[in-house]
Amino acid sequence: MVLTNEDFFRLIVSGIIGIGIADIIFLHSLNIIGAGISALVDTVYSPFVIFFAYIFLGEHLSPLQFLGAGCIIGAIIFASLKLQNIPTTRKRLEYGIILCILAIAMMAFSIVLVKPVLSKFQGDIPKLMWIAGFRLVPGSIVPLIIFLLFNKKQNLLKPLKDRKIWFPLIGGSVFATYLGIFFWIIGMSLTTASTASILNQTATIFILIFARIFLKEPLTKRSVGAILIAVAGAYLVFIG
């Protein structure tokens, strides 16, 4: 089975919207609202995917999966409920939240757009690896254009002179940008977009765990409770 012109079109548009444009908007919103509120707003991801998958792919969830989705989203909201030290004014906060929702909606649309291509190559690991890499190419065009336009004015390469940021920057780029997207694409190819998106929401819970391991951030009773609720929700989605 080979990629058609329509498949290439879907991959290119998906990369530009979901990686090139959405990531920039999301990172800008993250600078405004902070990680805690961003994690809370991120709960709109699976509802957006479910909505787009219903409209464009005709997907449906079972009642048990809806219950599991509610558990996962509820767990994230529960973990983020007592937010402190909000880093901006109310007006900027609202602006940042709107940007974050827009970015997440674009990510959701982009993955639903490419879902038919992934389903064609279900289980074909080499082909899915190639698709993950190819999708990054158009996704890199937008940041490259922005770099060429604004580098002289803002000296965007100046922070790279600090070699302390090289390891986390390169490591994050490899693990999050390519390997993360690669495994995400494999999962998306093996099940429905709606189910995969719900399970993908557990990333927020993993952030709590890894923040404890690597950043020594406190793991509160609220966080532990949220993790247990999210695990139960993921199990319901899986068996549903």
Could you say what each language-model-derived stretch is?
Residues 1-7, 52-64, 120-123, 186-192, ...:
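Helix-coil boundary and interhelical linker segments in multi-pass alpha-helical membrane proteins
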Residues 47-109, 212, 218-240:
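Juxtamembrane helix-loop boundary signature in multi-pass membrane transporters
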Residues 9, 13, 17, 44, ...:
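Hydrophobic residues within alpha-helical transmembrane segments
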Residues 1-13, 23-33, 81-99, 125-126, ...:
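Membrane-interface interhelical linkers
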Residues 103-117, 176-185:
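A broad helix-preferring feature
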Residues 1, 106-141:
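Juxtamembrane helix-loop-helix junctions in multi-pass membrane proteins
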Residues 16-18, 27-79, 130, 137, ...:
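Specific alpha-helical transmembrane segments that line the substrate/conduction pathway
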